[in-house]
Design a protein with these regions (language model features):
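N-terminal export signals
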Residues: 1-11
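Bacterial signal peptide processing site
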Residues: 13-15
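Post-signal peptide N-terminal segment of mature Sec-exported envelope proteins
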Residues: 20-39
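Short acidic-hydrophobic sequence patches enriched in Asp/Glu that either
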Residues: 26-30, 49, 143
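Short amphipathic, basic-aromatic surface patches that mediate peripheral association
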Residues: 42
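N-terminal domain-start signal
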Residues: 45-46
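Mature-region segments of soluble proteins
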Residues: 52-63, 67-196
């Protein structure tokens, strides 16, 4: 992560009055529940909602992603919401149920690798059509998978880059000492990854 992105993440953790920039408020609540299913809280580790990761995701997409990515994310979000409506038999983002969202996440992330590769291929083959405004060129599942994968990747990036996780959960040294290339991770950091 670059210093600019890290400062963006830090601002997300300190901002008490926040208005979404890229997503609307209903989408934010819905996506926030998805991020909380991806990284739930436990007794030892705070989850996505406690760390305000949705703020980072919204600001990161708005400030760092390019216009083409904005189109892909918005189009794939629309498809994912349609997919959610079909699978849950609902017609609003306001009355979502966590169990239904969890089932949809399992469907996409626990599917065969070959199915996921097919979705990625389908999405990649239809990028130009999506940019031209035709999301019908890609399957709902392919667009939904792209959206969920993007949100999952950003959630994990935000989690690993958050100050609390960096200082309290991951191995952290503000000024690294000596460099040792081949060491046992269990011995060096008790099996924890280094903070960013």
């Amino acid at each position: 992560l670059t210093p600019a992105v890290l400062s963006l993440l830090q601002s997300c953790q300190n901002d008490l009055d926040w208005n979404p920039v890229f997503f609307d408020s209903n989408q934010i609540k819905f996506i926030s529940e998805i991020t909380n299913l991806i990284i739930p809280s436990s007794e030892e580790v705070p989850g996505s909602n406690e760390l305000n990761l949705i703020r980072f995701i919204d600001l990161y997409i708005s400030n760092v992603k390019n216009n083409d990515d904005h189109i892909f994310i918005q189009s794939s979000l629309v498809s994912f919401i349609e997919n959610y409506y079909i699978k849950s038999k609902k017609n609003s983002l306001i009355n979502y149920e966590i169990e239904e969202l969890d089932e949809i996440l399992k469907y996409f992330f626990k599917s065969d690798v070959s199915k996921q590769e097919l979705w990625v291929s389908d999405f990649n083959n239809s990028k130009n059509s999506i940019l031209d405004g035709s999301i019908e060129s890609s399957s709902n599942d392919a667009l939904s998978f792209y959206f969920l994968k993007t949100i999952r990747d950003l959630t994990i990036t935000a989690f690993k880059g958050s100050e609390y996780i960096g200082k309290n959960i991951l191995a952290f040294r503000p000024v690294p000492g000596q460099q040792k290339g081949c060491v046992d991770l269990l011995e060096t950091t008790n099996g924890r990854a280094w903070t960013i």
